[in-house]
From Swiss-Prot:
Belongs to the frog skin active peptide (FSAP) family. Caerin subfamily. Keywords: Amidation, Amphibian defense peptide, Antibiotic, Antimicrobial, Secreted. This is Caerin-1.2. It is found in: Secreted. GO terms for cellular component: extracellular region.
Amino acid sequence: GLLGVLGSVAKHVLPHVVPVIAEHL
């Protein structure tokens, strides 16, 4: 379903996004 797709995308994206956000905090 859609939530499954969003979950899969989040698992791939979050590991890359979190460090970038952390650098700006």
